[in-house]
Each structure stands twice: as structure tokens, then as C-alpha cells.
Amino acid sequence: MKVVKFGGSSLANGQNVEQALNIILSDPERRVIVVSAPGKRNDDDIKITDLLIKYANMTLKSENTDEIVQTIFMRYQEIGHFFGVADEELKVIKDILLALPSRNYPNSSYLMAAFKAHGERLNARLIAMIL
């Protein structure tokens, strides 16, 4: 059994995810897959983790987060659409994002860590949908 990890730039868009999946599927011994949050698609782009940090900060300031949630979701949606994943299946990702502010966190540091961790969590869910 082999464990493989893919970083953010390897999972930044549909084409990169496709290359990662080809690597995974080329060896049946690759059974454990560890994924990072999607990284930058180009030099001017923003990593999902940075968008989640912004989302957390906006939540802590009680600011409207509709736009940042949509921006984050659209990144996952774009990758999902590349593989033909239906919007109905992808909706769970948006639902998880929308639920983050309503969870109980012991303090702001915990909230920040939880928001950031969702980059990987949501990407793992997306890759599972694709596979």
C-alpha cells in the first residue's frame, strides 16, 4: 500500500486534478490519498486557504460573507464541472461553507483553524465525488 499527497498547486484546477488522478489510478498500490486545498491557478490568483482566512475574519467581524462564500464555492464548482459533477452533488460543499459561522467555537483561534481546515476537507470530499 502506498500513501500519496498532492499539494495545492497540483489541485488548483480541473486539468491539474486530472493529472493527479491519472497518477493515482496508474498504480493500484496507491490506496491512501492526501489532498491539500486548491492552490493558485496563476500568479494573480488567491489560494483557497487564503480565501477561507478572509471568510473567517469577516465572520469574526460580523460582516456579510455572501460574496466570499460564493467565491470559494465557485473554485470547487469549477473543478467539479471539469469532471461533470452535477451542481446537485456539489451543493453539499456550499452547505458546509454556509454552516461554518453557525458552529460553536471555543474562541477565535479555534474558529480560524476550523475555517482553514475546511480547504482540505472540502477538497477531499470533491475528489471522492470525482472518483
Regions found by a protein language model. Give the residues of each.
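Nucleotide/pyrophosphate-binding catalytic subdomain
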Residues: 1-130
